[in-house]
């Protein structure tokens, strides 16, 4: 990527995008999520060219996700599924690349400049 386009925002959902979508539970509840070892490799290549941020609606697993995202050098926002569309809209859909995997992401993907879903 040659040019710097800081008005462009790359917004990623955490669960199902950075994770495999599975949670590990104990008798105390959610204790672990599984992340890919190389999640930040591609993001490191583009982070100086656009704004990158992460969202999650997982209240119980937020600390786990927040730690992983912070370790990668980014910020995680807690955004409920009902608030998700409005949150992304603040960044102007024509300036948003969005990556999500859930039913609450469909309208955001349709309205964003580029919408991406994991395989």
Where do the protein language model's features map onto the residues?
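Alpha-helical substrate-recognition element adjacent to the catalytic core
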Residues: 1-82
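Short loop/turn motifs at secondary-structure junctions
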Residues: 6, 73, 92-95, 111
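Short, well-ordered beta-strand core segments
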Residues: 10, 76-77, 96-98, 115-117
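Alpha-helical segments flanking ligand/cofactor-binding loops in enzyme cores
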Residues: 44, 89, 106-110
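Short beta-strand/loop segments at the ligand-binding rim of alpha/beta enzyme cores
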Residues: 49-53, 91-98, 113-114
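Generic hydrophobic secondary-structure packing signal
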Residues: 61, 84, 108-111
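Short phosphate-binding loop-to-helix
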Residues: 81-92, 105
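Acidic, Mg2+-coordinating phosphoryl-transfer loop and its flanking beta/alpha structural elements
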Residues: 98-119
């Amino acid at each position: 990527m040659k040019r710097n386009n800081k008005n462009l925002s790359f917004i990623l959902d955490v669960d199902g995008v950075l994770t495999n979508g599975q949670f590990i539970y104990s008798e105390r509840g959610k204790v672990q999520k599984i992340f890919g070892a190389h999640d930040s490799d591609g993001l490191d290549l583009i982070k100086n060219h656009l704004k990158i941020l992460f969202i999650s609606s997982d209240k119980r697993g937020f600390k786990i996700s927040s730690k992983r995202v912070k370790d990668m050098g980014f910020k995680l926002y807690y955004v409920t599924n009902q608030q998700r569309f409005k949150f992304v809209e603040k960044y102007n859909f024509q300036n948003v690349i969005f990556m999500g995997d859930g039913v609450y992401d469909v309208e955001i993907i349709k309205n964003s400049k580029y919408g991406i879903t994991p395989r």
